[in-house]
């Protein structure tokens, strides 16, 4: 399945997940499903095309080569470390193995958004 093979309903589901991730984390999330001819280099090039790439996260999935790449901008990488990305990839692979592309992307995006969420700050001066 290439990007053009996604149904409108699937596109909306992915878009909703990306919007929710932005609300949760304050970071811009993007997803790409399609060929990555140069592997990770292609994913990095696609990430660079995102407005505000330094604060953005791209999940790139190449179904034909069965690869998943997560590219984080320099600012996004502060909150989303390699371990978080590996966990998200593991979650996505699990869904993909069950033939659930959209669920996999949604799981990965939500996991990354939760890791990027700013921690709640409790002040000592606030009443309990």
Predicted regions and their residues:
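A structural boundary signal for the start of the first folded domain, especially the loop/turn
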Residues: 1-56, 63-128
């Amino acid at each position: 399945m290439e990007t053009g093979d996604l149904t409108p309903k699937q596109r909306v589901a992915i878009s909703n997940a990306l919007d929710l991730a932005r609300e949760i984390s304050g970071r811009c999330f993007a997803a790409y499903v399609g060929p990555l001819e140069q592997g990770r280099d292609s994913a990095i090039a696609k990430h660079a095309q995102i407005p505000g790439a330094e604060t953005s996260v791209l999940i790139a999935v190449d179904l034909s080569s069965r690869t998943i790449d997560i590219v984080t901008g320099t600012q996004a990488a502060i909150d989303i470390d390699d371990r978080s990305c590996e966990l998200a990839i593991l979650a996505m692979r699990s869904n993909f193995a069950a033939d659930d592309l959209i669920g996999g992307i949604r799981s990965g995006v939500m996991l990354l958004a939760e890791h990027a969420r700013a921690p709640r700050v409790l002040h000592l001066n606030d009443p309990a």
